[in-house]
Amino acid sequence: MYRPARVTSTSRFLNPYVVCFIVVAGVVILAVTIALLVYFLAFDQKSYFYRSSFQLLNVEYNSQLNSPATQEYRTLSGRIESLITKTFKESNLRNQFIRAHVAKLRQDGSGVRADVVMKFQFTRNNNGASMKSRIESVLRQMLNNSGNLEINPSTEITSLTDQAAANWLINECGAGPDLITLSEQRILGGTEAEEGSWPWQVSLRLNNAHHCGGSLINNMWILTAAHCFRSNSNPRDWIATSGISTTFPKLRMRVRNILIHNNYKSATHENDIALVRLENSVTFTKDIHSVCLPAATQNIPPGSTAYVTGWGAQEYAGHTVPELRQGQVRIISNDVCNAPHSYNGAILSGMLCAGVPQGGVDACQGDSGGPLVQEDSRRLWFIVGIVSWGDQCGLPDKPGVYTRVTAYLDWIRQQTGI
């Protein structure tokens, strides 16, 4: 019987160093491949902005929709933003959709038209026409399921450059840097402000030296404190500057007129409010634009967060600082502020207190006239106070005292026509 010859096999072993090298090389190649894949899927993305104009067929326009400060404006804008957000978060674009913001409500016949800016993130190699088509498809679903908001179904979207999107958003008052970029992240933090963090803040300079703060409330008017002009109210001696640095400002503005409240009383700090009219209108940018005036009925509850900004001294009798600083404080009720151990009845109805119980965070010399602001649910900023007076700076139970802006809205409108 035929039997194949037995072949003697020789065992061969790879060098352990070679094995180790192959394993390590394989792991490295795999790691690099995964890293590149993660990068291109998660990080190699670009932001894209789109604008859509929604015609609301069953909402009648009225004067309360003129200002983002009114509850009616906030409610309607919030409903539209929530509807858009919910629609995209439940769609196949849930991971690409970032945020939507109503930039403006305006009259359209007897109805309302809402101009909305939306932000998405797609990988860079996505086709623009394809992205737009996908977004429009989702919006059409929304228009068919818009609840009790009747929206014209012929709505279309327009692609915007980053600058064009910013231009839409800065024309609305109170837009901070996170709103202008439609970012989901807050930029606040620390005590030294970043450029553009508080774009309405101005420095009022007497004979070219920083003297007081102020706030742009439109492109022609600055809101500030009356006591800033006790020594000199000649407009020719004043200029206003924008930017976080008083040494290297971004913009210089000449002053045409200074309007001080007729009933300002320096002894009691009553009616400590003034307006500065500029010689020329300001062209708004992402770093320079106005803060919102509040509605007369705006709620400013005790304990709520507010921010005060300025170039004032960091301690009582200290020197002003060249870079803008910010401080987080809490609103304090007038009853608490009027307690015997605090201001013992000196806080009047046209005043507002803010600080921290233990002291340490406060406005100080050089901050006078600057803004105390709060952010609403739509991330718009409103000026609720004007730095007015206080007992030294940052003492416990001696918070900063501010002019209550809601008490002077009629006066502001009479002077400015805003």
Swiss-Prot record:
Membrane disposition: Single-pass type II membrane protein
Query: What controls how active this protein is?
Result: Strongly inhibited by diisopropyl fluorophosphate, leupeptin, antipain, aprotinin, and soybean trypsin inhibitor, but hardly inhibited by secretory leukocyte protease inhibitor at 10 microM.
User: Which cysteines link up through disulfide bonds?
Assistant: C173-C292, C212-C228, C337-C353, C364-C393
Q: Where is the active site?
A: H227 (charge relay system), D272 (charge relay system), S368 (charge relay system)
Q: In which tissues is it expressed?
A: Located in the cells of the submucosal serous glands of the bronchi and trachea.
> Which loops or segments lie on the Cytoplasmic side of the membrane, by the record?
1-20
Which sequence ranges are listed under topological domain Extracellular?
Answer: 42-418
A molecular function GO annotation: serine-type endopeptidase activity
Localization of this protein? Cell membrane
Per UniProt, which keywords does this protein have? Cell membrane, Disulfide bond, Glycoprotein, Hydrolase, Membrane, Protease, Secreted, Serine protease, Signal-anchor, Transmembrane, Transmembrane helix, Zymogen
Residue ranges constituting the SEA domain according to the UniProt record:
46-163
What does UniProt give as GO cellular component?
extracellular exosome; extracellular region; plasma membrane
> Transmembrane residues, as ranges?
21-41
The record's EC number reads 3.4.21.-
Q: Which SUPFAM superfamilies match?
A: SEA domain (SSF82671), Trypsin-like serine proteases (SSF50494)
Q: Which InterPro entries does its entry note?
A: Pept_S1A_HAT/DESC1, Peptidase_S1_PA, Peptidase_S1_PA_chymotrypsin, Peptidase_S1A, SEA_dom, SEA_dom_sf, Trypsin_dom, TRYPSIN_HIS
GO BP field:
proteolysis; respiratory gaseous exchange by respiratory system
In terms of SMART domains, this protein maps to: SEA, Tryp_SPc
Q: Which residues are glycosylated?
A: N144
One Pfam family hit: Trypsin
| PANTHER family assigned | ACROSIN-RELATED (PTHR24252), HYALIN (PTHR24252:SF7)
Q: Which family does it belong to?
A: Belongs to the peptidase S1 family.
Q: How does it assemble?
A: Monomer.
This one is known as Transmembrane protease serine 11D
Where does this protein come from, organism-wise? Homo sapiens (Human)
Where is the organism placed in the taxonomic lineage, from the top?
Answer: Eukaryota, Metazoa, Chordata, Craniata, Vertebrata
